[in-house]
UniProtKB/Swiss-Prot annotation:
Protein S19 forms a complex with S13 that binds strongly to the 16S ribosomal RNA. One of its GO terms (biological process) is translation. This is Small ribosomal subunit protein uS19. The gene is rpsS. It comes from the Bacteria. PROSITE patterns: RIBOSOMAL_S19. GO terms for molecular function: rRNA binding; structural constituent of ribosome.
Amino acid sequence: MARSLKKGPFVDDHVMKKVIAAKKANDNKPIKTWSRRSTITPDMIGLTFNVHNGKSFIPVYITENHIGYKLGEFAPTRTFKGHKGSVQKKIGK
């Protein structure tokens, strides 16, 4: 179920403060954040975020196409290394 329109998008306060400060100072340094749950708003266009994936920080450059998504959607937390059986079947044939 989608969030109510009257509530607006959720963005952590500390992330929004960093966005406003970066826009005001015209700063191009990436904003380091652990807040994967924050929604991307139009204020964030042109900024780079370092989003934590549980192990390291993944750089995410925000464009117009990212608006409305969450920051965490662009920093995958799992690495898929393939199914064990599929490799063995190819070797056996």
